């Protein structure tokens, strides 16, 4: 599995991030797991084609007491296995990492 990880976070920082993710309605229903939505404009042609049946698409963000991991696999929330489930390409990967880094900056989380 490919990940983008940030560690050495304080428990207070991860609690603040968890609250922000809940406020944005990114909760998954599982403790410590959040879904970061993939912008529609950045979906692959196959993902656009499958969006009605397999979407929405998201990257999983796993939040632990002192770290976070952004999974770089684009998951189809409507289906577990499909050709549209694939690793983020370079542009999407860079966008999602920058998005997460900006969120951490906005929350004054150094990481």
Spans of model-derived segments:
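Terminal, regulation- and interaction-focused segments at domain boundaries
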Residues: 1-19
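A generic structural signal for beta-strand entry/edge sites
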Residues: 3, 31-33, 67-69
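A structural detector for beta-sheet-dominated domains
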Residues: 7-9, 37, 73
């Amino acid at each position: 599995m490919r990940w983008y990880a940030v560690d050495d976070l304080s428990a207070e920082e991860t609690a603040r991030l968890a609250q922000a993710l809940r406020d944005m309605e990114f909760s998954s229903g599982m403790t410590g797991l959040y879904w970061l939505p993939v912008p529609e404009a950045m979906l692959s042609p196959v993902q656009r084609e499958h969006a009605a049946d397999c979407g929405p698409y998201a990257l999983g963000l796993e939040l632990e007491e002192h770290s976070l991991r952004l999974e770089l696999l684009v998951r189809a929330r409507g289906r577990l296995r499909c050709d549209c489930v694939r690793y983020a390409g370079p542009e999407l990967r860079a966008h999602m990492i920058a998005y997460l880094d900006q969120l951490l900056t906005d929350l004054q989380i150094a990481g």
